[in-house]
Amino acid sequence: RGNGKIIQELEGEFRGAGWNVIKLLWGSNWDPLLARDKDGALRQLMLDTLDGDYQAFKANDGAFVRKHFFGRDPRTLELVSKMSDEDVWALRRGGHDAQKVYAAFHAANSHVGGPTVLLVKTVKGWGMGRAGEGKNTAHQAKKLSDDDIRYFRDRFNIPIPDSELPKIPFYKPADDTPEMKYLHERRKALGGYLPARRTRCEESFTVPSLDTFKAVLEPTAAGREISTTQAYVRFLTQLLRDQALGPRVVPILVDEARTFGMEGLFRQIGIYNPEGQKYTPVDKDQVMYYREDKAGQILQEGINEAGGMSSWIAAATSYSTNNRIMVPFYIYYSMFGFQRIGDLAWAAGDMQARGFLLGGTSGRTTLNGEGLQHEDGHSHILAGTIPNCISYDPTFAHEVAVILHHGLKRMVEKQDNVFFYLTLLNENYAMPGLKAGTEEQIIKGMYLLEEGNGGKKTP
């Protein structure tokens, strides 16, 4: 990115999105120069200089900076005419000026009315000197020479004698020093010395019995065939009616609510919008119109799989971050799940997320009308790479109900750190219903659906 100016690029993006932008670019010892820059020559030079040049300046010395930066304009060269090369070299970037860093954070913390971003200019490998400061090799430096270590010690005033330097001893200030007192005060004010992660929620819930979902478990009547996607929606609808656990359910959609037959939930629980619904939806005269509400429960993310997955992760880790159990159900076209947001799915595993991912319209034959790019026959291969992701590809409605119920028992009652992935179909066919006693086999992945007819055996 040496040909560009990343800070100005980011500033434009954040300001365009309505953010408050604070730029921390230059240290305090630049202030006298800027005060004497009556015609704006130094400011213009700063704006015209590319990021690649700024890196090169800090990879050399004061004489180089004088010639190749200030020397680009006679007016700026005159500004530093009475400064030594050492003084020129000592001109700091804003991110290395403690007072300005404090002032920037104070300004950000004091701002009201919107989010604030700090764009801070620093030096790669700051403090390493010739061993890596401002150099691309800073990332590859595995060890420092004795001279480089001595420079680092002197640069940061670390009180270690030359005789001890070859051992590279760990330095810890005495407990009664201002530095240590400050650190202890801040840690206590921030709640402790080590980052803490809650592994179990103090809340507890009892999952409704499997019989609660009998509408999904029973055989379908002749002429009333359904898909496994419809089976999921019926299960979810029933779960939402549970007085205890229902309010903790977080249905998440990314644009496909009507594709999955979930529009009935618009009226039942509404779509969450912190501002309510300021417009009249075009389908207002319908029973299942698009209803947004401040108290809505559905998260409708638009065409934004990464946003939907991020919302899912937030709810799926609420047991740890908020000590509050939430049960997110995120449904999407299965081709746009692990294939598109695989890194987030892996991160969810790292974070010990608990919840359900539902890959709708799965398979290679049920969504050709929208193009081959929708044909998913491999999301389970990707899901299988995440150790705590438990995946199923159910065929029948009762399997969906048994698996979802089992997942609730594990994640809500037992608080196991796993999450579930189910692929769902949109093809309607007859559902045989649950045969008593097969629940455990369904969870294991194989069960006897029906006896064979005793036909001729192959030799």
Locate predicted features.
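Long, well-ordered, tryptophan-enriched scaffold segments
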Residues: 2-219, 441-445
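Thiamine diphosphate
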Residues: 75-95, 99-103, 110, 168-442
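Short gly/pro-enriched beta-turn/loop segments at secondary-structure junctions
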Residues: 11, 111-113, 386, 415-417, ...
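Short, flexible, glycine/charge-rich loop motifs used to bind or transfer phosphoryl groups or to couple energy/partner
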Residues: 108, 382, 448-451
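C-terminal catalytic subdomain
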Residues: 132-135, 140, 147, 418, ...
